[in-house]
Amino acid sequence: MQIKGYSNKEMSRIALGTHLGDVSDEVSALYRNAIKYAVQNGIYSIDGAINYRGMRSEKDEGIAIRELIESGIVKREDIFVTSKAGLLFGDITERLNPKMYLENILMPQGIAESDFFEYDGLKQTLNPAFYEIALNKSLENLNLETLDLHYIHIPEITSAGMDETVFYDEMEKLFAWYEGKVTENKIRNYGIALEFMGEEPEDAKWHFEFEELKRRADKVSDGESHLKYVIFEYNILCPYPRTVLSQHVNGEALTLADACLKLGLKTVASMPLAMGDALKEHSLKELLEFALDGCENIVVGSKNTDHIKELLSFL
């Protein structure tokens, strides 16, 4: 039975990421313990995606959340849960890789291989029917009735493969679908999860304007859209979302981060430690302070309770 309710809080300043690690039982056990420790000690936001670790991360989140709630340690409203969809995914516990999942599960439900655009091994789609399947599966994995936030995952892949106007039209259709999910109480808010735009803001193939996306979201919601968050890589080695004037709002050239803020979209920094690379020359304190100074929230991936203890000192 799915747990009812949703968070009564905004995303915590630091959220726990769940993308790292292999699909083994050992890693899953570490994640479950890490999630429970983090939530009980102030990092109450958990960032995930249906494709992380072949769905195992979401399933681990679901087990940890249920154990916390059923034991009375926390209530549903104390936890902020995030997921993402858009990339082709598999189900490792059912021994289905993404190709097999497409053929055996998605295609019988009307999803076609031609719905996806591909880049560097990642297949991405904006087809609302795919998101319907993915969202329902995420809610099942997480044992939840409502997600606090659901992201469109790496839409740059699709935008790079189609005409700009067609891309905005497809995003508008997807926004309309999302607004319907808010009405159905399946999500509270939605957002955009970027990969390449943050890393390579001057590369035209990854470019689209957030002002136009916000306009399209407002259009399908009578000006009351639930498009609220944008997540992108931001760290000392990738400062571009706050240094490169890559967006425009009311004719003014702005950085990605400043454009989001001007449009009323909350900014979330992913990979604040640059996958550990930045720790070679900078302290954890330097890196977290840099990311927190530049964005309203950050996501730090960890399955290690000792690492989480270090993070807690920055809350």
Language-model segment annotations:
Residues 14, 33-42:
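A short, Lys/Arg-enriched amphipathic alpha-helix followed by its capping loop at the start of a domain
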Residues 18, 25-30, 34-35, 50-54, ...:
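Beta/alpha (TIM)-barrel catalytic core signal, keyed to glycine-rich beta->alpha loops juxtaposed to Asp/Glu
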Residues 31-32, 54-82, 168-177:
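Aromatic-lined substrate-binding rim segments of carbohydrate-active enzymes
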Residues 67-77, 142, 182-186, 220-225:
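Short helix-capping segments at alpha-helix termini
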